Amino acid sequence: MFYQDPFDVIIIGGGHAGTEAAMAAARMGQQTLLLTHNIDTLGQMSCNPTIGGIGKGHLVKEVDALGGLMAKAIDQAGIQFKILNASKGPAVRATRAQADRVLYRQAVRIALENQPNLMIFQQAVEDLIVENDRVVGAVTQMGLKFRAKAVVLTVGTFLDGKIHIGLDNYSGGRAGDPPSIPLSRRLRELPLRVSRLKTGTPPRIDARTIDFSVLAQQHGDNPMPVFSFMGNAFQHPQQVPCYITHTNEKTHDVIRNNLDRSPMYAGVIEGIGPRYCPSIEDKVMRFADRNQHQIFLEPEGLTSNEIYPNGISTSLPFDVQMQIVRSMQGMENAKIVRPGYAIEYDFFDPRDLKPTLESKFIHGLFFAGQINGTTGYEEAAAQGLLAGLNAARLSADKEGWAPARSQAYLGVLVDDLCTLGTKEPYRMFTSRAEYRLMLREDNADLRLTEMGRELGLVDDERWARFNEKLENIERERQRLKSTWVTPSAESADEVNAHLTTPLSREASGEDLLRRPEMTYAQLTSLAAFAPALEDEQAAEQVEIQVKYEGYIARQQDEIEKQLRNENTLLPATLDYRQVSGLSNEVIAKLNDHKPASIGQASRISGVTPAAISILLVWLKKQGMLRRSA
């Protein structure tokens, strides 16, 4: 039976990728359907109760700059906010927030249920309707069929999910939820490369059984950071501390003595786990010289007694988990309320996707989130937004859009996935970006909000706030450029008190701000350069733009040089055996990856600069040298 109304876009799955995809498509005016197996778990934090971190916070800010949901939700649900790398340069500073799971899920659901053009329907999806290599709809568990011009798969760890606790295992999408086995089998019938990955989660502890009096506290920052460019600290709920404990030799002995009961070490788990979030058994074995590992005890919410022990993800049996937990200081009498576990699941090779996250083989079918081999809420949300907006554009007969590596961490993420693929869960770091100084958290809106407006993602309120900020930055920079102080002026003594070397010539406000010892706050506290901007975001931009102007200009030059070849297009049907001069290895890799551009080709392992030169010459001779806009 077909549902009476067709849709423009169908989203399958209501996690962090699915909710952003649904919101993006609906914001762009397309009739959107979000199918989920359980409406009550929309926006569920399946693992750690945190948003942000190094690289990840950058993605959240970019999603927000494009009108997305995640930053707004965490501002309403964050119970501890910190700036990581606060003492380092602005390129690597990152916002991180501890979340109240219930408040976060509530904020997401309220946003979804109040979004025009979006319908939510509770039913698991078991099949796709594919006609002539084009997806045209989805079939639910009860046989109800929905038609649409585009479908976005955001199914997380649910595809043929298998949960492991010790040597026991059972089918599951995550603890308490069924897997999606029929859909997994259906997708395996399509011409797509599929493999298995693994992730894990720690046991949850009853806070009433922990002796916090012997543990060090870790508080959030004051003043409190804010995630959304539209947010403010008054939105944050009550703030609470986290606590720190450590593993010890007793902990490590328990783990080493029970490795034969670990599904990972016993060879029961085939999927590869996340390199940068290893299980505690992995850490103990890989870092055998370490006699302790730091564990953060993170509250899961203001109305919950559950504690998330960040750092002891494990799939060891329950009795061993109890021994591990009780071996640590403050946890001698602790009780576990949910056991830790590992989960294996299907993922599909992202090299089979276009940069828009549309399948190269099934027209109108998009993939986003863990199904593409990534790990983390933030990576999923960013992909969801991109897939959702491109599904909306496809349904409106418009060309797809994807940011370049030089524009956004989202561009880095998608390019890495679509060009290189991944054999392990992919996590974003600032080190993955070549142009970190340009891709900062603080300027995500300056980089992306104008494009978001053109795409139809940014509403009038955000657009007005953005333009006001731009005007404030420009006006303040002009004021500082045109305000001068001379060594003989009355105000010189006050200025010199803040300088390591006194004034020897006339200096503008911008000249003084370029000095490493002078901050914007100090400068505008001086009578000659007061008052400071009330707009804190604009004030931050003024300081960063002035202090790093030379470095930013140099990096912009690098980007422009790189873009000359980056955007040279490669035909999707090109057989690289036609290109004389390429080695057999290069031919095989290019035919396997099918890069969309010279830039993508240059990042494939084994494709040398010499091979790129040969390819450019051949394209020119064939009259095929074309660049994307």
Curated annotation (Swiss-Prot):
Q: Where in the cell is it found?
A: Cytoplasm
Primary location recorded for the protein, binned into one broad class: cytoplasm
Q: Name one GO biological process term.
A: tRNA methylation
SMART domains, alphabetically? GIDA_assoc_3 (SM01228)
Q: Which UniProt keywords apply?
A: Cytoplasm, FAD, Flavoprotein, NAD, tRNA processing
Q: Does the keyword Cytoplasm apply?
A: yes
Instruction: Give the InterPro entries listed for this entry.
Output: FAD/NAD-bd_sf (IPR036188), GIDA_C_N (IPR049312), MnmG (IPR004416), MnmG-rel (IPR002218), MnmG-rel_CS (IPR020595), MnmG_C (IPR026904), MnmG_C_subdom (IPR047001), MnmG_C_subdom_sf (IPR044920)
List of residues binding FAD: 13-18, 125, 180, 370
Query: Which GO terms label this protein's molecular function in UniProt?
Result: flavin adenine dinucleotide binding
What highest taxon heads this organism's lineage? Bacteria
Q: Which residues bind NAD(+)?
A: 273-287
Q: SUPFAM superfamilies, alphabetically?
A: FAD/NAD(P)-binding domain
Q: Which GO terms describe its cellular component?
A: cytosol
Q: Which cofactor does it need?
A: FAD
Q: According to its UniProt entry, what is the function of this protein? A: NAD-binding protein involved in the addition of a carboxymethylaminomethyl (cmnm) group at the wobble position (U34) of certain tRNAs, forming tRNA-cmnm(5)s(2)U34.
State the oligomer form and interacting partners: Homodimer. Heterotetramer of two MnmE and two MnmG subunits.
Q: Which family does it belong to?
A: Belongs to the MnmG family.
Instruction: Show the PANTHER family listed in the entry.
Output: GLUCOSE INHIBITED DIVISION PROTEIN A, PROTEIN MTO1 HOMOLOG, MITOCHONDRIAL
Report what the protein is called. tRNA uridine 5-carboxymethylaminomethyl modification enzyme MnmG
UniProt source species: Salmonella typhi
Lineage, please?
Bacteria, Pseudomonadati, Pseudomonadota, Gammaproteobacteria, Enterobacterales
Q: Give the gene that encodes this protein.
A: mnmG
